[in-house]
Amino acid sequence: MLTDLHKVRNIGIMAHIDAGKTTTTERILFYTGVNHKLGETHDGASTTDWMEQEKERGITITSAAVTCFWNKNQINIIDTPGHVDFTVEVERSLRVLDGAVAVFDAKEGVEPQSETVWRQADKYVVPRICFVNKMDKLGADFYFTVDTIISRLGAKPLVMQLPIGSESEFIGVVDLIEMRALVWPGDAKGDVTMGAKYEVQEIPADLQAKAEEYRAKLVETVAESDDALLEKFFGGEELTVAEIKGAIRTMTVNNEIYPVLCGSAFKNRGVQPMLDAVIDYLPSPLDVPAIEAHDPRDEEKVILRHADATEPFSALAFKVAVHPFFGRLTYVRIYSGRVDSGAQVINSTKGRKERIGKIFQMHANKENPVDFVTAGNIYAVIGLKDTTTGDTLSDPANEVVLESMTFPEPVIEVAIEPKTKADQEKLGTAIQKLAEEDPTFRTEQNQETGQTVIKGMGELHLDILVDRMKREFNVEANVGKPQVAYRETLRRTVEKHDYTHKKQTGGSGQFAKVQITLEPLEVTPETSYEFVNAVTGGRVPREYIPSVDAGIQDAMQVGVLAGFPTVGVKATLVDGASHDVDSSEMAFKIAGSMAYKEAARKANPVLLEPLMAVEVRTPEEYMGDVIGDLNSRRGQIQSMEDASGVKVVKVNVPLSEMFGYIGDLRSKTSGRAVYSMQFDSYAEVPKAVADEIVQKSKGE
């Protein structure tokens, strides 16, 4: 473990699904000596994809943190997922990174998901270098990929290397700073070094002119960034390698440019120079600004925390995972101070004390125990009981709260029915564990059907959650179709509705009479129901009043229109009557429930549906098709604006119209548009659509 922070890099590898991100990470681990056998994503054996579903689908879901060493520098890699349903994981990893390597597919250029992840990295101001991967692929085109970085991302790439050959002829790269060729020996002879050795050669004659042209552009960009260098440049002096690298580092750390390198991770070419670039150009924890924290007792008070071992301890928990052997592992980024194994800290987000158990430096799924941790590093800790994703840990004498990560509300749900009683118990355990790991996953019990309803961020998200329940927790269950979470509400006031509950069957009977008024109530995040007791003269004994309230609330769970929960109701108990012998809490609960059901039918009940705030980023040429499609989905356009080479459309669309949208958007825009959506509000469903939903709910 290094305490010299100049030599530490906390980086993420970010990319579109299938651009070769996991293979690139694998190669880094191989060349830095952590892995002795290469795991290929194609065979489902890679080191960072350690959950079963990831191995099967060949996609990375959970960002595992891996530490490795390169030329006496320490690199902590956070593997980020590249699928749109996992953007919460991506955003979470970006919060704790200092820099990133953006991997692009040399044939496809900037793909939709690379654009989404790039925009998220912009939001967190993460410096990046670009690695144009898959140079060995049929149709690979380095120059086209660089053009798409400009046209689709609106970014300023700085070409640092040129490819020597492409497709099956790709053998190495031209290093434009040192003006030399790096060539990897062909592995047709079964090259035993797996690309670990390369030769430095003269630049091939047919590339000399192009190399000089790109070198001139590079030197000019460097010179313009610094007055002293500009003077030297105009004076006709050569800039030294150290001056060029220093200027590129400054510009990269400031997000002014993005160095571009190329290679083929799969064919083991170009990975080592990319590692050199990570060390040369990406920031160390000392290069990034101090993190802003708040005083837990005074939100307004800002406290700065620097990457300094002598400052009070502060850290952010950015991931909780369940390890098969150690149980609960909490991944933390240490922002300031140091902490020893066994020390007591405070979870300042929740105000609870925690004890740090064992501390590990993680290598994908192996772990290396350490005695203490210091600022600027990323570790996994066991022993934290109450800490979940996004919580701050700090020194009990100097509490701070690092800005909490805010997570969107889940919008899609699916019912799960365990097959046996034993499965019901396993499901309970699974839900608790998964909710600890993933803050965007919620559950509730459907009172009427007894089914467990799980909620998530999208169709793939729910698929994976259900899959994990079955596989990791052995839950056998029937799974329903994804459903939209509709609600009902009342639009009209119904005054003084009477209901009498009477049952006379020998012995003591049941008797309760109530008179209620129902009124529409504005729904706010705090209130969606209000009960008022306006009974005078003890006509309903005081002890029965809560029963009437409970009866009304029970009835509201299953709406009168289509059985969906009802919101936005003010119920007033106006009058009633009781019987000395036959009245009971149960009788009044039933009376309250039935009175509500009858009155609600007269109160003009309507259906509400979740509206999603959708943001689509599309190249201008597809704008007409995109808007036409959104209109056909009952979308209401909120705004249209320009952003670095693309049009941004903000629109509110009912969730029910968004199923399968990703496929339609891809086909309408050749996969170039991207969208994100999150819950906005509930709105009334138009009558024609509502009638259809009501009929469906009644099985007509």
UniProtKB/Swiss-Prot annotation:
One of its GO terms (biological process) is ribosome disassembly. Disulfide bonds: none annotated. It is found in: Cytoplasm. It comes from the Bacteria. GO terms for molecular function: GTP binding; GTPase activity; translation elongation factor activity. It holds the Pfam family GTP_EFTU. GTP binds at residues 15-22, 79-83, 133-136. GO terms for cellular component: cytoplasm. Residues 6-286 form the tr-type G domain. Gene3D superfamilies: 3.30.230.10, 3.30.70.240, Elongation Factor G (Translational Gtpase), domain 3 (3.30.70.870), P-loop containing nucleotide triphosphate hydrolases (3.40.50.300), Translation factors (2.40.30.10). Keywords: Cytoplasm, Elongation factor, GTP-binding, Nucleotide-binding, Protein biosynthesis. PROSITE patterns: G_TR_1, G_TR_2. SUPFAM superfamilies: EF-G C-terminal domain-like, P-loop containing nucleoside triphosphate hydrolases, Ribosomal protein S5 domain 2-like, Translation proteins. NCBIfam families: EF-G, PRK12740.1-5, small_GTP. Belongs to the TRAFAC class translation factor GTPase superfamily. Classic translation factor GTPase family. EF-G/EF-2 subfamily. This is Elongation factor G. It comes from Leifsonia xyli subsp. xyli (strain CTCB07). The gene is fusA.
